[in-house]
């Protein structure tokens, strides 16, 4: 009787683990970049850790001196406010 409970538990946890990996693999196939929409978690990470607006070297190309680094875009802008709005 004890052996049957262990086998049942092993089968249950194996199926649970298989379901987890199947759901995880299915979630990795879902890409939101095709429509230029970032996931909220990704946006929060970019805002806190990597994204920043930096002033480029003078003279700036087309007077766009503030460049987004590591954010949603990698473009340069006329003002820091424009850069921050586009980058974060």
Curated annotation (Swiss-Prot):
Tissues in which the UniProt entry reports expression: Expressed exclusively in endosperm. Found in basal endosperm transfer cells.
Keyword match Signal: yes
Signal peptide bounds: 1-27
Main localization (coarse): secreted
GO cellular component: extracellular region; plasma membrane
Disulfide bonds: 65-87, 68-76
Post-translational modification: Glycosylated.
Keywords associated with the record: Cell membrane, Cell wall, Developmental protein, Disulfide bond, Extracellular matrix, Glycoprotein, Membrane, Secreted, Signal
Glycosylation sites: 36
Annotated compartments: Secreted, Cell wall; Cell membrane; Secreted, Extracellular space, Extracellular matrix
InterPro entries linked: Meg
Purpose: Regulates maternal nutrient uptake, sucrose partitioning, and seed biomass yield. Necessary and sufficient for the establishment and differentiation of the endosperm nutrient transfer cells located at the mother:seed interface. Exclusive expression of the maternal allele at the early stages of endosperm development. The maternal allele is hypomethylated. At later stages, expression becomes biallelic. Regulated by the transcription factor MRP1.
Record family assignment: Belongs to the MEG family.
Name this polypeptide is given: Protein MATERNALLY EXPRESSED GENE 1
Annotated source species: Zea mays (Maize)
Gene: MEG1
